[in-house]
C-alpha cells in the first residue's frame, strides 16, 4: 500500500492510496488500513469480514487514480476521460507551481442542490458565480485532476470573442440588432473576466489582439472587417501595414499586415485555473477530482450521478465538460459537438539577441488568418508559444508528424528559430459546435439540466462569462437571456450548413478529413 495523493478534509488529512497498483482508495490518516472503503468498481471485502458488495462498473480502467495522462484519449470513443489521470506535460503545468488543495474524490453517496460536471474555466466560474451571486454552493465533479482538460492546454489567449464567427458573419446570420447585442455580450464578458482575474497572479499580458494576414490576399478581408468593427460596432480596430507590423510588433515573415483589436490579453492558463479553484472553494463550493460521472439517471426530479466513490444526487446539473464531453455522458449531449485536436509547442528560453533578431517586439496575443489558424505569442519568460491544428483522432495525436507540421509553420514565420530546441509539446481537445457558436442553455425547460459548451477555441475569456450565465440559468434567473447563444440546443452535424441531422454524426470525421484538405488549399494556395 503506497500513498499517491494528499488532500484536505476539514481538520483531517486523507491519503489516496494504491494497493497492488490496481485501483485507488481513500483512507483517513488515523484509519486502520484493513477497514477502509475501497473506491473501485470490483468485489470488495471490508474489515476482515466476508461482507461482499458489488458496485456497478462501466469502465474499470477509469478508476485508477493519478494514472499518467492518456495521450491517445478520444472523446468520441472513450466513455469517460479517465479517473484521476495526471496532467498533460504542458509548459503551463510545469510553471504554475503546486496545485491548490481540493476536496478530494467523492467517497460516499450524497445529496446536493447543484452539481457541476467539469472543473475547467467554465465549471469553476459557474461555481464562483453560483456562490457569490445566488447563494448556492455547488459540488463540482472532475474526472481527473482539477482543470485537467483544455483549460490548462490552450494558448492562454483571452480574446473578445465567443465562437468562431466574425462580426460580419453575425450580421449575415442574425441581423444587425442581434449582432450588436452579441458584441455587447462579448464586451461585458471581457470586463467581467478582467474583474474576476484582478487578484489572480496569472501573468497577464495586456495590449490587445493582433490578427495577422498570412498572405496578401487576406488583407482585403481584414480591411473590410476592421471597417465594420469601427463604423458599425464602434470598436476601435485598426489596420497595420506590413512595415508597421514588423517595425513595432512582430517580424512574421508570412505577414502582409494585420488588424489590431483593442481588447485582448495573454494569461497563464494553469495559474488562472488554480486561481479559480481557490476562489470557488473560498466561497463554499466543493471541488472533487477523480470523480468521473460514469452513469446518469434522472428520477423523480433528482439526477443520480454515479461516480467511482458514490452516487451524487443533485436537484440541478450544469455540464461544463468542453472538448472532453463523452458521447455517453447524457443523451442530450450526444453528437452535439465536434471535438477538434489542437497542438501546441513552447521553445526553450530565447536570448535577448534571438528575440531581437526574430523581431519578437510584443507580448500581445496573435492569431493568423488561416482557417486552420496559428496562435502564438512571446511568453513573459522569453519563449515562443505557438499552436495550430493536430490529428483527427486521439490515436493519431502522438504521431510526431503533427508536431513537425507545427514546427514547419513556426519556421515559415520565424526562420531564425529553425534550430531552436523545443522544451514542451502537447495537444488537447477543443469543443467546436456544428454552427461555430456556443450555447449556454437549458435544453428542456422542464428538466433541470444546463450546459455551456462549444466555444470553438475562444473560451479563455468567454468561459468566465459563460460560467456566470450558466449560474444564472441554474439559479432560475436565465429568463432574460435572449440571444441565440442562450436559446435552443447545440445543433447536430450539417452538410454545407443547409441540412442538419444526427444521421450525419457517424461521418463527422470523414467530413473533417475532407474539410482539412479544402482548408489547406484555401489557406496556402487559392
List each language-model region with its residue ranges.
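C-terminal catalytic lobe of FAD-dependent flavoproteins
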Residues: 44, 394-396, 404, 408-514, ...
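N-terminal Rossmann-like FAD-binding beta1-loop-alpha1 element of flavoenzymes
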Residues: 114-139
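Glycine-rich FAD pyrophosphate-binding loop
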Residues: 133-153
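Active-site substrate-recognition segment that forms the wall
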Residues: 156, 199-206, 310-312, 316-353, ...
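N-terminal glycine-rich dinucleotide-binding loop that anchors FAD/FMN and/or NAD(P) in oxidoreductases
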Residues: 156-175
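Rossmann-like flavin
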Residues: 170-279
